[in-house]
Amino acid sequence: EGGGMYTPGGRGGKVIVVTSLEDSGPGTFREACETGGARTIVFNVSGIIHLKSPISVRAPYVTIAGQTAPGDGICITGNSFLIDTHDVVIRHMRFRRGAQDVAFRDDAVGGNAVGNIIVDHCSASWGLDENMSIYRHVYNRDESGHGLKLPTVNITIQNSVFSEALDTYN
């Protein structure tokens, strides 16, 4: 439902299986998110993935199918998860930013999304700026030096909970 209801996500693309709870390397969530091309990310592991640096999804046409994880599912913690593209579907994921590095007051889930985004059956907590914020910045390098904020379009956030922010900016 909603504005993002027509996004194809990773439909028709390759299926990438996450086999490791490590932050980076073969079979990791980071590797799957940073791969190009249409893709559906599934899990054959469950547990906590502790990020040492933010994950940025930059290549469009991706579905993250958290419901495929066995047991208690997947929780992303320790750093931010950023949507910096279009046509993304995220289902059944937990994001817990946490206060490991308070010098960077970032969101649990955020990014510079263009549009056609679905976030469904997800939760985000312990963000240091907001728990979730999606907006679009386009940086204009004209003589003024100011960036532009453009609208993000066709976003659906449904059946999700965003709670327990850690800072006064939330």
Where are these regions (language model features)?
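Structural detector of coil-to-beta-strand junctions
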Residues: 80, 108, 131, 168-170
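Blade-edge beta-strand/turn elements of extracellular beta-propeller
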Residues: 20, 73-76, 165, 169-170
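Extracellular beta-strand-rich solenoid/capping regions of secreted or surface-exposed proteins
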Residues: 29-37, 48-65, 72-91, 97-115
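Acidic/polar N-terminal loop/beta-strand segments that form early-domain functional surfaces
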Residues: 19-23, 43-46, 54, 67
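Acidic Gly/Asp/Thr-rich repetitive segments characteristic of extracellular carbohydrate-active
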Residues: 1-41
